[in-house]
From Swiss-Prot:
NDH shuttles electrons from NAD(P)H:plastoquinone, via FMN and iron-sulfur (Fe-S) centers, to quinones in the photosynthetic chain and possibly in a chloroplast respiratory chain. The immediate electron acceptor for the enzyme in this species is believed to be plastoquinone. Couples the redox reaction to proton translocation, and thus conserves the redox energy in a proton gradient. Its main location: plastid. GO terms for molecular function: NADH dehydrogenase (ubiquinone) activity; quinone binding. It holds the Pfam family Complex1_30kDa. Belongs to the complex I 30 kDa subunit family. NCBIfam families: PRK12494.1 (NF009141). This is NAD(P)H-quinone oxidoreductase subunit J, chloroplastic. Its EC number is 7.1.1.-.
Length: 158
């Protein structure tokens, strides 16, 4: 099912795949990683001036990874702002997605967290480094195929 935004992207010949709507009626679009920079700029020009959230998830054990962007069109006179959900799927072997930090600054920590937990590399991100785990940590803790290191942390009981 194609929504209003999908029709607008198709009219401007921007490659995407409509995935329908979520339970709140928010349109979901799939974008290829190589198309993401141009579509992100187009969405910003269209009025999606706020990146509400960005997250990632492991689709299946040993399968692909997904990066999800929730964009909102914030306007002074809008009772119900327009929203869209963008999903970008990448392979586990080459998990690279262009960063949108230069468009939405709020993606800074969110893309870093997705990198830290899933190993998705956000190309051209200015500070892509671990944000939750120590820099020396090996692996990506939220991947379904992650093997927990064999160690125990001792904590003081106060």
């Amino acid at each position: 099912m194609q929504g209003r935004l999908s029709a607008w992207l198709a009219k401007h010949q921007l490659a995407h795949r409509p995935l329908g709507f979520d339970y709140q009626g928010i349109e979901i679009l799939q974008i290829r990683p190589q198309d993401w920079p141009s579509i992100a700029v187009a969405l910003y020009v269209y009025g999606f001036n706020y990146l509400r959230s960005q997250c990632a998830y492991d689709v299946t054990p040993g399968g692909g990874l997904a990066s999800v962007y929730h964009l909102t069109k914030v306007q002074d006179d809008a009772d119900q702002p327009e929203e869209v959900c963008i999903k970008i799927f990448v392979s586990r072997e080459d998990p690279r997605i262009p960063s949108v930090f230069w468009i939405w600054k709020s993606s800074d920590f969110q893309e870093r967290e997705s990198y830290d937990m899933f190993g998705i590399i956000y190309e051209s991100h200015p500070r892509l480094k671990r944000i939750l785990m120590p820099e020396s940590w090996i692996g990506w803790p939220l991947r379904k195929d992650y093997i927990v290191p064999n160690f125990y942390e001792l904590q003081d009981a106060y």
